Amino acid sequence: MRSDSLIKAVIIAAGLVLGLVLSATPSALAGQFSIGTWKTAQTIAPFYYADFVSGEDSVTVYPFTNPADQKNALLAGSLDMCGTTVAHAIHSASMGQPVVMVAALCNKSSALVVRKDAGIEAVSDLKGKRIGYVPGTMHEILLRETLSRSGLSAQTDVSLLRIDFFDMGLALSRGNIDAFLSGEPFPALAVEKGYGEILAYPYYKEAVGDINAGMLVTRDFVKKHPEKVQQLVTAHARASRHLARHPDQWLTRASAFGTQKSVLEKAAANMELAWDMDAAFVSRVRALGQRMQALGMIRRQPDYNALIDLSFVQQARKELTADE
């Protein structure tokens, strides 16, 4: 009888252990990191984390096509860290979602493109024209800011047409639109193919500047595993620095995502791999949040002190300095 009871106890204990393992989030598994990002040249850094973590650690990168899906996977516990646009991070935080931005991912990477030989030489020439855009994105904000600075109303002076980023080039080449504002490599591709030309790079230092995307973790991950967050942020910083110092390697690897290297070389000057954040970065994030609320994209401002944690990049800065 005692033997039967002992066997039963062992089986129950084993079942409990198995249940804990199966229900564990990635962060609970020591040395195993799950990261989400896009397959673009400007968001490539996570694919290099494995080169900059300790030998016992492993990194699995999951590609996504949009920031919302990455963030949802993060909140569900399927990812330890993910990329997102700064605009989406603000939107998520304004809704009370427990996300924390712990590093930048990329800056710049956007451009306003017009049809080649269409006689559009200044933003003011877009009056009465059709412009492709994706609502609710960073690019919509940049487009509206660019139009406003040239005295144009997005409501009355131009026609904004909702077009997916992947379809903008075709629409421009066919004459269905006169311009579009999107992220790289689509502007460079329009130039490479000969149907478009760059009208403007929509970066305004006294306002939003050139911020674009960052890396998110959950508040719970920061609280329970700060040392793992630091590992990832430092790996991100080292990967970003390595790629910036080796542009040929960066663009060659990025071309495997489906864009010709010649196009990426045209786009390279407009793409900035990033990791560091400082007070100026936070000020630009706040400015972006104000623009989003003015446009009705968010109802209230998030708590920026809770959204952005500078401590991890500050430590990474020290570690990278020590590397030199």
Enumerate the predicted regions with their spans:
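Short, solvent-exposed loop/beta-turn-alpha elements that line the ligand-binding surface or hinge
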Residues: 54, 203-207, 274-281
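Secondary-structure end/capping motifs
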Residues: 223-300
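Sec/Tat signal peptide C-region and signal peptidase I cleavage site
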Residues: 25-30
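Bacterial N-terminal signal peptides
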Residues: 11-24
